[in-house]
Amino acid sequence: MSSFLIARSRGVDMIALPVFPSRRLFQTELSYHVDSGITKPEELADKRLGVAEYQQTAALWIRGILEHDFGVSQYKIHWYMERSEEMSHGAATGFKPPAGISFNRIAPNKSLASTLLENELDVAHVASPWVLRANALDRSSRIAGKGDWNKIKPLFPDRMAEGARFYKQHGFLPVNHTYIIRGDIYRKCPWVAFNLYTGFVKAKALAREQLLERIPTALFFAPEYAAMTREMIGDDPFPYGVKANKVMLDAIIAFSHEQGLTPRKMTVEELFAQSTLDL
């Protein structure tokens, strides 16, 4: 979503659907090294914080939440980025660190996990430095590092409590991704946006009906956790549409501009297909 905002602010010919298949409470995935002296998020000023990529959506939400909810300015943190200049979203957008930001790159033979374990970072966006998903860009799954794993702790020991706090305060869960239509296709076939949106809405409804049936049976208390989640954030934690996501969209647009990723605040009319704006 962040790279899409950047691209649209530069006039890239594409349009989005208000369909958000992935949401995460990114701040709850931060881990810290106990030797950093950190005990709570308000103490991150002057600390070294590592993210996979500076411009990506996860890092945007982390910066915005740390600043607006915990009073830690992005300018008070020393930022470290794992992905290389070539292997990153920034390679496509021509990313340059915003003025005034303390920005550093992690050495190519190291990773977020290894630098955190070896106390070269105080905090990193890795929920578990020793259990990481492999992908084509991030190195932590291949370079786990050496160190005492017992010294790595979650910044938010009770992730569910922090999630409940955030949702109660803001009324939404942060989005990660959306779906994009090329501008030439949208102009040639404008009906495709509404039809795709309708299809995604129906698919989500079918998936939710079968949710508990698809949870592995090894997760013995899945129904109880599903009930807890429903009590915390309601029946639909993944709402689609512009109207249902207005507060969230206003927040991510504002964060992008505040953080110097976009030169101005975008409008939803610039971002989403016309036929979906009233949905």
List PLM regions with ranges.
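Short, glycine-/small- and polar/acidic-enriched structural segments
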Residues: 1-89, 94
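Pocket-lining segment of extracytoplasmic ligand-binding domains
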Residues: 2, 89-212
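Short helix-initiation/N-cap motifs at beta->coil->alpha
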Residues: 39, 77-114, 267-278
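Short, solvent-exposed beta-strand edge segments and adjacent coil->beta transition regions
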Residues: 46, 174-178, 235-237
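Conserved aromatic-histidine-acidic binding/catalytic patches
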Residues: 50-54, 58, 104, 240, ...
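Secondary-structure end/capping motifs
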Residues: 180, 185-258
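Tryptophan-rich aromatic "cage" segments
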Residues: 247-279
